[in-house]
Amino acid sequence: MFVRLTLADVKDGEMDNALEYVKNTVMPSYDEISGLLGIAACATNDGRFMAWSTWANEEAKNASVDKFNEALAGAAEMLDGQPEVMEGPMVAGQQYIGVSKEGGDGFFARFVLGGGTQEGKTYDDVAEFMTNTVYPAYENVEGIYGTGACKVAE
């Protein structure tokens, strides 16, 4: 699995417009994209726009990049500068519930961005920790959507 995370500063008063644009324009443009597993967007607690997508593999993500850029072009006027993009292969991931693209209740997303692994540890160690410790701990937590770890840098 492959994940892409985008963070962007949004011009004052444009956050709701940016989120609506993603919901009403970007997401529907992905209906026929092969290999897309999920896409979501939110406003962060520090006022930034955040969007993420998960893919079957990097090739599926790369095959859709032109369509992605075309769909996002309309949001440029709402942004205050260039977005920051992080992407990489998932080293571990677990989804607990599904969220419908038709809408309904929103959900809360929490991302923890780190700078790699601890000295002497590998991404295999991260995957093992997630699989053996984090996933079982969250298995019966009501309302949790998913957890994961992604390798974005060496």
Over which residues does each language-model region extend?
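Short S/T/G/P-rich N-terminal loop/turn motif that feeds into the first structured element of a domain
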Residues: 1-50, 54-154
